[in-house]
């Protein structure tokens, strides 16, 4: 796929950037800043990684159900998401991470303790927003970008 992207760069890359800009704009409006969004994205990524250990299905609707279930009940994992790890993954200072995690906790997105680290723990309303608005838009827009790739590949082979 990398070679395909290199050979079709001009025809494809602006679609990728459009996807990224649209997603980032919506995320910045939601979380208030680039740093907050980047930190939240790492927290959601960690939650998805832990969730995959419990997932039996690959279907989005069933994954959303499991997402909601684990957000309410929590999950057993040895994987602890620390300020240090978030800092390492985002290149933000630990103090910046700490401040933003505190804001996310105040806004009912996460829970933090020294023992358990940062855990995705949204309010019902926040979870509904993620599942019914934010992720729906992400999936739709990513699908549209992948359609562009698929059409370009078909054009090349026809």
Feature map (PLM): residue ranges:
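Short amphipathic alpha-helical interaction segments
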Residues: 91-106
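Short helix->loop/beta-hairpin flanking segments within DNA-binding domains
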Residues: 38-79
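N-terminal leader segment of winged-helix/HTH proteins
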Residues: 1-41, 45
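Short glycine/proline-centered loop/turn elements that form peptide/ligand docking sites
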Residues: 60-62, 79-81, 98-102, 120-122
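Short, amphipathic alpha-helical interaction segments positioned at domain boundaries
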Residues: 126-158
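A short alpha-helical element within helix-turn-helix/winged-helix DNA-binding domains
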Residues: 78-90, 104
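Short, cationic-aromatic polyanion-contact patches
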Residues: 65, 82, 109, 114-138
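Short gly/ser-rich anion-binding loops that grip negatively charged ligand groups
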Residues: 29, 72-76, 90
